């Protein structure tokens, strides 16, 4: 029994080496047709990395031929199935542009956009892929409004937009926590302008006021009055938008301090 198992194992290893040898032989010395047939075989067997190598090898030979449409689609899918999402997005997009009348164009357009979505990193990293994903998904919805993938595309856009909102909010908070209050106020304004319905609105307006407060109280005398008045205006807008905010008890105390500083400035100006 044990001998039989060893024999079977040896056969499997030998077969593996034989298959590997056949692949390398066709890859390096096979005709374009042999490479194409083996690439399709590797693709069907879900050996996508080997399939990609062969497809890349034969692409120049098949450019302009009927098989090229199938090759480009399989290359796109192979990258997608190996989780190389940035490359998959690129190749699916290339397929859509090269074969706009293909029966697979809608599927390819969605998978291009969805690949960008899958390539989108966590909010703390660069969001280039996130922005490209939103644009691609919006383009897909515009071109294929009746597609059954539209609800998924809208859901993906919402998720990606929330990620960009969080990125914008965290950047503004970072300026605030590093005491760069001028930059913080600009960043909070950008967040509120770019994402009108943002769930961060209350906290953003609160932190913008505190940035204005610290900017005013820490200013040199010639800028203090102007900046304190600006902080008071920022607070008025905050209170108008959130009359029941949990932050109001704190901010009203700060407003009282600012009013006292303004009174002191008025006294100094009167004495001069």
Enumerate the language-model features and the residues they cover:
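Acidic, polar-rich low-complexity tracts and alpha-helical solenoid repeat scaffolds
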Residues: 2-8, 16-272
């Amino acid at each position: 029994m044990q001998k039989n198992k060893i024999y079977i194992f040896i056969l499997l290893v030998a077969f593996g080496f034989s298959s590997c040898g056949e692949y390398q032989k066709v890859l390096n010395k096979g005709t374009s047709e042999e490479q194409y047939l083996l690439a399709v075989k590797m693709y069907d067997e879900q050996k996508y990395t080997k399939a990609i190598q062969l497809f890349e090898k034969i692409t120049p030979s098949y450019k302009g031929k009927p098989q090229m449409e199938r090759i480009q689609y399989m290359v796109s899918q192979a990258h997608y199935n190996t989780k190389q999402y940035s490359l998959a997005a690129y190749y699916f997009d290339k397929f859509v542009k090269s074969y706009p009348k293909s029966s697979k164009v809608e599927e390819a357009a969605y998978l291009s956009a969805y690949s960008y979505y899958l390539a989108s990193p966590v909010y703390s990293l660069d969001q280039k892929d996130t922005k490209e994903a939103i644009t691609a998904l919006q383009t897909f919805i515009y071109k294929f409004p009746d597609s059954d993938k539209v609800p998924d595309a809208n859901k993906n856009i919402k998720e990606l937009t929330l990620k960009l909102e969080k990125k914008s909010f965290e950047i503004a908070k970072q300026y605030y926590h590093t005491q760069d209050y001028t930059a913080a106020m600009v960043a909070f304004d950008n967040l509120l302008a770019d994402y009108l319905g943002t769930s961060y609105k209350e906290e953003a307006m609160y932190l913008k006021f505190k940035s204005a407060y610290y900017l005013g109280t820490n200013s040199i005398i010639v800028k203090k009055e102007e900046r304190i008045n600006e902080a008071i205006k920022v607070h008025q807008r905050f209170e108008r938008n959130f009359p029941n905010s949990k932050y109001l008890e704190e901010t009203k105390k700060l407003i009282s301090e600012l009013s006292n500083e303004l009174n002191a400035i008025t006294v100094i100006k009167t004495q001069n």
